[in-house]
Curated annotation (Swiss-Prot):
Organism: Methanocaldococcus jannaschii (strain ATCC 43067 / DSM 2661 / JAL-1 / JCM 10045 / NBRC 100440)
Catalytic activity: Co-precorrin-4 + S-adenosyl-L-methionine = Co-precorrin-5A + S-adenosyl-L-homocysteine + H(+)
The protein, known as: Cobalt-precorrin-4 C(11)-methyltransferase
Name of the top EC class for this enzyme: transferase
Pfam family, one: TP_methylase
Family to which this protein belongs: Belongs to the precorrin methyltransferase family.
Listed PANTHER family: COBALT-PRECORRIN-4 C(11)-METHYLTRANSFERASE, SIROHEME SYNTHASE-RELATED
Gene3D superfamilies the record matches: Cobalt-precorrin-4 Transmethylase, Domain 1, Methyltransferase, Cobalt-precorrin-4 Transmethylase, Domain 2
Pathway noted in the entry: Cofactor biosynthesis; adenosylcobalamin biosynthesis; cob(II)yrinate a,c-diamide from sirohydrochlorin (anaerobic route): step 4/10
UniProt lineage: Archaea, Methanobacteriati, Methanobacteriota, Methanomada group, Methanococci
Amino acid sequence: MDNNRKVIIVGAGPGDPELITIKGKKAIEEADVIIYAGSLVNEKLLEYNKKNAEIYNSANMNLEEIIDVMVKAVNQGKKVVRLHTGDPSIYGAIKEQIDELSKYGIDVEIIPGVSSLFAATASLKVELTLPEVSQTVIITRPEGRTPMPEKEKLRDLAKHQSTMAIFLGVSMIDKVVKELIEGGYREETPVAVVYHASWDDEKIVRGTLKDIAEKVKKEGIKKTALIIVGEVLNPKYYAYSKLYDKNFEHEYRKSHKKF
């Protein structure tokens, strides 16, 4: 494909406009056309664009309309940025856009972004992978209008008892809790729900699987929130990392262990 015929998909980050990457900000500054996910992307990011840039809010557009705008702009030699929330690779619906654009000989460059998952864990001040507690993170969502593969039902994933990050599920919090408990998590398992991670109106609700649903409802949280489940949120015990153990030797550091 012609490298001049491309669309740049940019991860806008979780909300705080300062959390976009330098490369992503530069792409916005240089773009002639920007199509952004208006219901999710912080509009303060649009302050970086050129004064004469064409701005489209994709919240009220369908896929065909989005592709049409991008194709026409590329054909006119314009630099096009598709601005997605968080990191485009997580529930970003980018595969279909890449495939549709390829039909017109248009390539795609992807600039990664900071996921809301990592903004949430930063606010919670937690480590998702604690030695001897959990070394696995499952990123998933409950079944809604988009069906889940049979092997990826929440109750089946819950059998692993690992750290779980659940997107797009707070509106179905009762169903989520029910499936997690049925899958094997204890009712006492720690849970945190982070609404609008990194935004000015961010809200954190902590609890357990036993009480988190009621707490979330009490706070009126119905969307744009992430559910994090697992013992890493409130570990009774964990082991320190071997990486910085003075008795552990690796290629960059000698052991202080006495023999």
